[in-house]
Amino acid sequence: MNMTENANTADVSGYSFEKAVAELESIVARLERGDVALDESIAIYERGEALKKHCETLLNAAEKRIEKIRLDRAGKPQGVEPLDGE
């Protein structure tokens, strides 16, 4: 697969977390093999950065949605609150 500048700048905002991670893993594997020309290495590295940022955004959003269960004195579920106590 030859990554061009268009592929590098393609919007990743619609990617699922799993799709972004899979592509990021593929990029890392290619870079680790070291068989990619310098210009292409830079382009796919930049693509990887975009994917990494997208994954971080998705993880942060998921973290904000996670809730922990509050228990009353008897240990019974009483409701939920944000995980970080906000």
From Swiss-Prot:
Biological-process GO terms, alphabetical: DNA catabolic process
Keywords assigned by UniProt, alphabetized: Cytoplasm, Exonuclease, Hydrolase, Nuclease
Catalysed reaction, written as an equation: Exonucleolytic cleavage in either 5'- to 3'- or 3'- to 5'-direction to yield nucleoside 5'-phosphates
Function statement: Bidirectionally degrades single-stranded DNA into large acid-insoluble oligonucleotides, which are then degraded further into small acid-soluble oligonucleotides.
Chief localization: cytoplasm
EC code: 3.1.11.6
Record carries keyword Hydrolase: yes
Pfam families assigned to the protein according to its UniProt record, in alphabetical order: Exonuc_VII_S
Localization per record: Cytoplasm
Organism of origin: Agrobacterium fabrum (strain C58 / ATCC 33970) (Agrobacterium tumefaciens (strain C58))
Example GO molecular function: exodeoxyribonuclease VII activity
The protein's name in its UniProt record: Exodeoxyribonuclease 7 small subunit
Xref: SUPFAM superfamilies: XseB-like
Stated family: Belongs to the XseB family.
Subunit-level organization: Heterooligomer composed of large and small subunits.
Domain of life, per lineage: Bacteria
GO CC terms in record: cytosol; exodeoxyribonuclease VII complex
InterPro entries associated with the record: Exonuc_VII_S, Exonuc_VII_ssu_sf
